[in-house]
A protein has these predicted regions:
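Terminal alpha-helical segments
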Residues: 1-133
Length: 133
């Protein structure tokens, strides 16, 4: 889905920037990342889900700083590609979104080696989004 369709569908709306909300969201993202880091690798689904939540919240902050509210995770991909001009990050986020959905909704299992690689990629993604914020 592209930004035009996201806006037409009501999944992206113009908003005024709310500094207090941004501060609260940044704290929430940090707590989720810390919670993920505190879990042992045996809780891999939870670690990945928490990191995904953290990075999605950081994307929400980035969108708010661009006066946008995004109501659909797929539209964050379009936001990264079309508004932020970071196509690679958009593709990477979409992979994380699909993996998280597969783990949470379809019972996908992931081996430890693959999980460790995903966690590293997610942490690098979070670092990059923080740099953009």
């Amino acid at each position: 889905m592209d930004m035009v369709n996201c806006k037409k569908s009501g999944f992206v709306k113009k908003v005024t920037t709310d500094r207090n909300k941004i501060i609260a969201l940044l704290k929430s993202a940090q707590r989720k990342e810390e919670a993920s880091n505190s879990l042992p690798l045996s809780f891999i689904d939870s670690k990945i889900t928490l990191l995904y939540d953290s990075l999605r919240i950081l994307l929400e902050v980035l969108a708010l700083k661009n006066s946008l509210k995004i109501y659909n995770h797929e539209c964050y991909t379009a936001f990264l590609k079309e508004i932020i001009n970071e196509s690679r990050l958009g593709d990477e986020f979409d992979k994380f979104r699909k993996l998280r959905n597969a783990l949470n909704y379809y019972g996908k299992e992931i081996n430890v080696k693959e999980a460790q690689a995903v966690l590293i990629r997610m942490k690098n993604f979070i670092k990059r989004i923080r740099e953009l914020n």
